From Swiss-Prot:
It comes from Pseudomonas aeruginosa (strain UCBPP-PA14). Keywords: Lyase. Its EC number is 4.2.1.104. The lineage of its organism: Bacteria, Pseudomonadati, Pseudomonadota, Gammaproteobacteria, Pseudomonadales. Belongs to the cyanase family. This is Cyanate hydratase.
Length: 156
């Protein structure tokens, strides 16, 4: 049976332990995701306390990180989601995503409504992917795919 968290504290403390153990052991996020049958982005989000993992994946990841049965239980718990407390993010990388939505949010909203109608794009029935590609002009580019199910607004 899955259990729900009542505050973000336990998962946040676990995330700090995950990051420390990952660094101590020289593991990558991909190393942790390999063999779970779950997307890299979802496993990483779970490690940061934003998703629950199935038992087998939680056990595998916890074992790789040298964590105990309590950690396995926490990794399976349904978290209080939302990792940016206090409004506008101050971390430069996270802020760029915030900035993208500040610039393109109303455009995305208008295009979603024009193409789909009144509704939302789900962040629950959702897939996220990130790829590093070479930029023909030099350097690298990040290709980020947000793939969410459209949910129409229904009158009641």
């Amino acid at each position: 049976m899955q259990h729900s968290q009542v505050s973000p504290n336990a998962r946040q403390q676990l995330a700090e332990t995950v990051v420390l153990n990952k660094a101590r052991l020289g593991l990558s996020w991909q190393d942790l995701a390999d063999g779970t049958g779950i997307a890299l982005t979802l496993v990483t989000a779970a490690m940061f306390g934003q998703h629950a993992l199935p038992e087998a994946a939680a056990r595998k990841v916890a074992a790789q990180l040298g964590m105990d049965d309590d950690a396995v239980l926490l990794l399976q718990s349904i978290p209080l989601r939302g990792s940016i407390p206090g409004g506008i993010p101050s971390d430069p990388t996270i802020y760029r995503f915030y900035e993208m939505l500040q610039v393109y949010g109303s455009t995305l909203k208008a295009l979603v409504h024009e193409q789909f109608g009144d509704g939302i794009i789900s962040a629950i029935n959702f897939k996220l992917d990130i790829k590093k590609v070479e930029d023909p002009e030099g350097g690298s580019r990040a290709v980020i795919t947000l793939d969410g199910k459209y949910l129409p607004t229904k009158p009641f």
